[in-house]
């Protein structure tokens, strides 16, 4: 949607928050 920081990092490339994905900065965001 808009880029929303999920307050989660994803050093292993996995986001545990529903709907969140790992971006190239290793931060989980929601579309």
From Swiss-Prot:
Pfam families per record: Cyclotide
Family indicated by similarity: Belongs to the cyclotide family. Bracelet subfamily.
Job of this protein: Probably participates in a plant defense mechanism. Inhibits the cytopathic effects of the human immunodeficiency virus. Has no hemolytic activity.
Organism annotation: Oldenlandia affinis
Keyword rRNA-binding in record: no
Keyword Endoplasmic reticulum carried by entry: no
GO biological process assignments: defense response
Domain of life: Eukaryota
Domain remark text: The presence of a 'disulfide through disulfide knot' structurally defines this protein as a knottin.
Cross-linked residues, Cyclopeptide (Gly-Asp): 1-31
Keywords: Disulfide bond, Knottin, Plant defense
Disulfide bridge partners, by residue number: 6-20, 10-22, 15-28
Signal peptide: none
Modification comment: This is a cyclic peptide.
Protein name: Kalata-B8
Cross-referenced InterPro entries: Cyclotide, Cyclotide_sf
């Amino acid at each position: 949607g808009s880029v929303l920081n999920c307050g989660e990092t994803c050093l292993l490339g996995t986001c545990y928050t529903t709907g969140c994905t790992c971006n190239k900065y290793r931060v989980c965001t929601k579309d």
